[in-house]
Curated annotation (Swiss-Prot):
InterPro entries linked: Calbindin_Ca-bind, Calbindin_six-EFh_dom, EF-hand-dom_pair, EF_Hand_1_Ca_BS, EF_hand_dom
Name of protein: Calbindin
UniProt organism field: Gallus gallus (Chicken)
Entries under SMART domains matching the protein: EFh
Binding positions for Ca(2+) 4 per the UniProt entry: 200, 202, 204, 206, 211
Transmembrane segments: none
GO MF entries: calcium ion binding; vitamin D binding
PANTHER family assigned: CALBINDIN (PTHR19972:SF14)
């Protein structure tokens, strides 16, 4: 079955949802925008008509919002709200725990328990299990394993079998995902280390809130297109959620500001 056929379904399984996303996010950048989004809207309307189904209220609202917009951009979270996805899988995209970047960062700290800078499949499975338990949902271990594998395939952009902070952050709604803004200001390791040492003014090996404030102000000043100084407090709060009792160590800040080097 093709992605277009899946759109005709009354309920879409987790595996079908992945296929739909993979098909329409044709450039693999983690978002549907421009032509991709318009193709999806057009084919969604055609598929529902072909199946003799009306657009659901969520679909109508979505088409009204993005149908004419040339600058529209949606992520996986937004797509999950539109399609009639199986209930337990849908819960991951409606999680109250992940409504803001700050909440997300705190969640990341909890599950990246070994501070490796990524979450492996076992850590991801624990994360998903906890989300379901918070929603008072119990599912069989085999189903949880299936969800974990699908999520890994869906978010693992570089196919290394584990999720980095920016990859898992696609569980956040686009508007909330401040990490998107920082993609354009990441530094190479040499630049990052130099900046860290410059702003770690007392040389104690970590950056505190005031030092981070100074660093972010300078970044906003140098990168006005990407970063908005009016959002400085939000950036700071979200990044400090990665800190250890107010101490932001090099490895944690690197997750935000240091580009991966191959």
């Amino acid at each position: 079955m093709t992605a277009e056929t899946h759109l005709q379904g009354v309920e879409i399984s987790a595996a079908q949802f992945f296929e739909i996303w993979h098909h329409y996010d044709s450039d693999g950048n983690g978002y549907m925008d421009g032509k991709e989004l318009q193709n999806f809207i057009q084919e969604l309307q055609q598929a529902r008509k072909k199946a003799g189904l009306d657009l659901t209220p969520e679909m109508k609202a979505f088409v009204d919002q993005y149908g004419k917009a040339t600058d529209g951009k949606i992520g996986i979270v937004e797509l999950a709200q539109v399609l009639p996805t199986e209930e337990n899988f849908l819960l991951f995209f409606r999680c109250q725990q992940l409504k803001s970047s700050e909440d997300f960062m705190q969640t990341w700290r909890k599950y990246d328990s070994d501070h490796s800078g990524f979450i492996d499949s076992e850590e991801l499975k624990s994360f998903l299990k906890d989300l379901l338990q918070k929603a008072n949902k119990q599912i069989e271990d085999s189903k949880l394993t299936e969800y974990t594998e699908i999520m890994l395939r869906m978010f693992d952009a570089n196919n290394d079998g584990k999720l980095e902070l920016t990859e898992l952050a696609r569980l956040l709604p686009v508007q909330e995902n401040f990490l998107i803004k920082f993609q354009g200001v990441k530094m190479c390791a040499k630049e990052f280390n130099k900046a860290f040492e410059m702003y770690d003014q007392d040389g104690n090996g970590y950056i505190d809130e005031n030092e981070l404030d100074a660093l972010l102000k300078d970044l906003c000043e140098k990168n006005k297109k990407e970063l908005d100084i009016n959002n400085l407090a939000t950036y700071k709060k979200s990044i400090m959620a990665l800190s250890d009792g107010g101490k932001l160590y090099r490895a944690e800040l690197a997750l935000i500001l240091c580009a991966e080097e191959n």
